[in-house]
């Protein structure tokens, strides 16, 4: 079951706990395979990962697609960044 609707689109909210990008990869896989291809990734609980490195990692994952349609990244400053708009 997905977490929320944004502009009539179902999104799954993920807030992974971890110290590497592996935790992000795992959560993206879970969301796409079992919940929704539209993902909101909140970095609030991630420690020791720089906020600047996460968007580049997400851009790489989105460019490969693998079932992901849209990613919105919420950084530690609580700013929402649409990763799809950075891909273009």
What are these regions (language model features)?
Residues 16-88:
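Metal-dependent nuclease catalytic core centered on acidic motifs
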